[in-house]
């Protein structure tokens, strides 16, 4: 058995089409959605990802602006830039590209973003809404993973799902999202201090690998027929043609055991970007409704 592919490119294409129509409708009402991205330093991977986000904006019809700051930018200077964007009436959504230099407290910067402009869905208020089940802005990658599975008609309700990794951008919010009333799965949160990691993973119907460790998930960790979602994007050198070699958190031979598996390229990545664009549109629509009711 060779696993079927969880095709994030195909699923995201349909989402982008819907978002383009929503953007046109907003423009017809005099609203121009706009995403502001702040990039600190010159990390090649971060720069490449930011540029891909802005290409998505252009394709959908969302305006975008990129604020580039040097690597030696102080935490105070960065937060000051964020506050300027918070006060800008033409900016619908804000993202500060992660990771940030070690000298900057990532949490303080995220907390400085206006929750009503938090396009990444990582502000404590929006994460709190996720916990309580109140409708808010959901972190992009967790939302994208759920959409990807739903698009392939993979039932999650009542299933046991192992989430390997407990980062604040994927692992933790994904566990909350999957165990919430909207999905109703049983979630096993696995991390580096967990005992019997392989055994815990092997009982799961769905395994989501988001540890950021190359090929940490071995074929022996997967029960036959399980669904595997590989979130990992690990840089493993450069090819002879000069292209960056990317590897996931899941060993390639796992495809011979799983029923479905997401590819490293074209799996979760396009879904994350689609959910970011969806968040920007949602923030624009919310702001439009607020102003409409206030008038």
UniProtKB/Swiss-Prot annotation:
Could you tell me what this protein is called? Bifunctional protein FolD
Pfam families xrefs = THF_DHG_CYH (PF00763), THF_DHG_CYH_C (PF02882)
Q: Does the keyword Nucleus apply?
A: no
CC terms in the record's Gene Ontology section: cytosol
Q: Which GO terms describe its molecular function?
A: methenyltetrahydrofolate cyclohydrolase activity; methylenetetrahydrofolate dehydrogenase (NADP+) activity
Family of the protein in this entry:
Belongs to the tetrahydrofolate dehydrogenase/cyclohydrolase family.
According to its UniProt record, in which pathway does this protein act?
One-carbon metabolism; tetrahydrofolate interconversion
Protein role? Catalyzes the oxidation of 5,10-methylenetetrahydrofolate to 5,10-methenyltetrahydrofolate and then the hydrolysis of 5,10-methenyltetrahydrofolate to 10-formyltetrahydrofolate.
């Amino acid at each position: 058995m060779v696993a079927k592919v969880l095709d994030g490119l195909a699923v995201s294409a349909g989402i982008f089409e819907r978002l383009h129509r929503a953007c046109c409708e907003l423009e017809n009402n005099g609203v121009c959605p706009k995403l502001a991205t702040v990039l600190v330093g010159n990390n090649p991977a971060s720069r490449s990802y930011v540029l891909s986000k802005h290409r998505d904006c252009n394709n959908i019809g969302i305006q975008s602006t990129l604020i580039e700051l040097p690597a030696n930018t102080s935490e105070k200077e960065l937060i000051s830039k964020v506050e300027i964007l918070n006060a800008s009436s033409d900016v619908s959504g804000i993202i500060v590209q992660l990771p940030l230099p070690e000298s900057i407290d990532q949490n303080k910067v995220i907390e400085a973003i206006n929750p009503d402009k938090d396009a990444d869905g990582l502000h404590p208020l929006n994460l709190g809404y996720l916990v309580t089940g109140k409708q808010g802005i959901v972190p992009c990658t967790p939302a994208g993973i759920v959409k990807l599975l739903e698009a392939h008609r993979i039932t999650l309700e009542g299933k046991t799902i192992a989430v390997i990794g407990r980062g604040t951008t994927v692992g933790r919010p994904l566990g909350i999202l999957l165990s919430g009333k909207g999905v109703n799965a049983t979630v096993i949160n696995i991390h580096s201090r967990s005992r019997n990691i392989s055994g815990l993973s092997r009982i799961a119907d769905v395994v989501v690998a988001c540890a950021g460790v190359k090929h940490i998930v071995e074929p022996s960790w997967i029960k036959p027929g399980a669904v595997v979602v590989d979130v990992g994007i690990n840089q493993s050198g450069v090819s002879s043609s000069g292209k960056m070699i990317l590897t996931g958190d899941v060993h390639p031979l796992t495809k011979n055991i799983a029923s479905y598996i997401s590819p490293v390229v074209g799996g979760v990545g396009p879904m994350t970007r689609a959910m970011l664009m969806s968040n920007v549109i949602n923030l624009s629509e919310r702001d439009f409704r607020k102003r409409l009711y206030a008038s």
